Amino acid sequence: AALVPAVTQASNPCSVMSAIEYGVKHLNVEHIVVMGHSHCGGIHGLMAPESIAGETYIQDWVGIASPALERLQAMTGDEDEKTRSRHCEEGAVLISLDNLLSYPWIAERVKNGQLKLHALYYDLSEGNLYRFSPESEDFELLFHSEKIDVCDR
């Protein structure tokens, strides 16, 4: 799952954050992209916790996205499972962006215009790449490629 822990959730050592810290502080990267995708096994585990019962590391990791699941559960509507999964997958990407901003050294660079954060979502079945637009508060089509045959869950 495309997850980044919040500063309060990161443990030492945290491989995700060590890579991001190195890129930001030593390589002076100007962009961080968090990209989720359809048919995400991590989000499936979050939405169907029985599928990862007893798998402590996986449970803890996908738990980072639990606010996305909580928001999804609070929504009313009769969306099918595929739509619900997509909402949760997209929500997890946005949570990761928020979590990145919980690190002062990232928030400072974003505020100063030295670093930009991007949220992308790739629909494997349709071959569509979406980018989150803060203006519309939605994921908008950025690019279309060939469809990929994947198993529907």
Report the location of each language-model feature.
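Divalent-metal-activated hydrolytic enzyme cores
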Residues: 2-30, 41-153
